[in-house]
Regions:
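Phosphate- and other anionic-substrate recognition elements at nucleic-acid/protein interfaces
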Residues: 1-159
């Protein structure tokens, strides 16, 4: 069975997380994860450009085959949903331009439920489960936005 690479994205306009796994047969292997920190930039247009450029680079570097995105969750105010939707759109366009035409969306509760068995799991709980599942140790250089993105990638792997 051929391997494939899944790129998980936790879109945000302040912090955008990404997580990359490689699927080998029936096993997921940790590749990388990180965060794009957008808090210093006040221009929404500049933030979207940075999201696009970063996601493009991640897709190109890791030769992504599929992308799993955390969808904006309901209950936040309309302005927040709109901003998150724009960030998600920038990531989707970046993926498409890098040849990734398989893009899947998962609600945060669904991703947590699939990964941990509990849709209300904390970010810390998700991180612990991912470390155990993937056999890696995360430290403070791996912000929780990155582990959220990795969780979305793992959610897609389990589907």
């Amino acid at each position: 069975m051929a391997s494939r690479t899944i790129i998980g994205i936790d879109p945000g306009t302040n912090l955008l997380g990404f997580g990359v796994i490689r699927v080998e047969g029936r096993k997921a292997v940790f590749v990388d994860m990180g965060v794009l920190d957008l808090r210093k930039d006040k221009s929404p247009h500049a933030k979207l450009r940075q999201i696009y450029e970063t996601v493009s680079e991640v897709c190109k570097t890791y030769h992504g085959d599929e992308m799993a995105l955390e969808s904006p969750f309901y209950g936040k105010n309309a302005q927040v949903i709109l901003k998150l939707g724009r960030a998600q759109g920038a990531a989707m366009i970046a993926a498409a331009e890098q040849g990734i035409d398989k893009v899947f969306e998962y609600a945060p509760r669904r991703a947590k439920e699939v990964v941990t068995g509990n849709g209300a799991a904390s970010k810390e709980q998700v991180s612990i489960i991912l470390q155990n599942t993937l056999g890696v140790k995360f430290d403070d250089s791996h912000p929780l936005d990155a582990t959220d993105a990795l969780g979305v990638a793992m959610c897609h792997f389990y589907q």
